[in-house]
Amino acid sequence: STPYDVLLDEYEVGMTVEDYDPLFAGLRERLVPLLEAITQAQKTAEEPAMPEGLVFSTDAQKSFCEAVSKHMGFDFEAGRMDASTHPFSAGLWPGDTRFTTRFDEVDPFSCLYAVMHETGHALYEQGLDHEHRYTPRGAAVSLGVHESQSRFWENQVGRTPAFWKVVLPWFRANFPDAPDWDEHTLNRLANRVEKGFIRVEADEVTYNLHVMLRYEIEKQIFNGDLDVDDLPTAWNSMFKAWFGIDVPEDRLGCLQDIHW
């Protein structure tokens, strides 16, 4: 057992580095070359692109994303959506569940998938047993199970042609200046793989690499093998090895996320 195991148990009961190390190592061994292969293939493939200068207003994104969240089942009579620097959700109690998102007027997917992710968390909170709130029976099973709900909605549902077929009328109504994309084109845009710096905006290929990077650094810090002062250097070095790009500033590296 290690000091880090104690903290892991707080978040996912019974899990240790002996469980995670081989899982992550095997996944990373395949993901790093897969990421390189996909990004190289995308350079020569005829991929749809976002037109330069196209603006997706904050109000239009809010309207579109609220419609998606409501269709997913979120009860706006027992919760609300707001804006914040970093998306998050908070289940204050079953009758008051809130989540936030952020807006980028040149990238509507950033807001959309943040909303779908946080709505997934919020739906789990709204679905807990109200009669047993404040007891184990009325609480989330674990953070891992909680995250499974958010990631399921964001990716298994949200990054499919079937999803885009359903929401296409709302997309066109809210963004009339966008090209006349069909559900397949929008799905290809939403599934583009990129070597990006920000975890919460990562695609399915790179997301787990972001998580593994944090895991490896956390192990070193809590086991006494890395000083906090050296964290940026360790982060940037590992990111370069796995993603093949340099982190230009800590705002895009170890300081990007309040719960990284």
Describe these PLM feature segments:
Residues S1-P108:
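Contiguous, non-catalytic segments that form substrate-binding/exosite surfaces or channel walls
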Residues G14-E18, A37-A49, D129-P136, V157-L168, ...:
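Inter-helical turn/loop segments and adjacent helix faces that build the functional surface
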Residues L23, S57, G91-G95, D104-L112, ...:
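Secondary-structure capping and boundary motifs in well-ordered enzyme cores
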Residues A45-P51, T97-E105, D129-P136, F197-A202, ...:
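Glycine- and acidic
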Residues S89-R98, A122-D129, E183-R192, P248-G253:
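Active-site-adjacent bridging/hinge elements
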Residues F103, S110-H130, E147-E154:
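Active-site recognition of the HExxH zinc-binding catalytic motif
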Residues V157-H259:
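Long, amphipathic alpha-helical stalk/connector segments used for oligomerization, subunit docking
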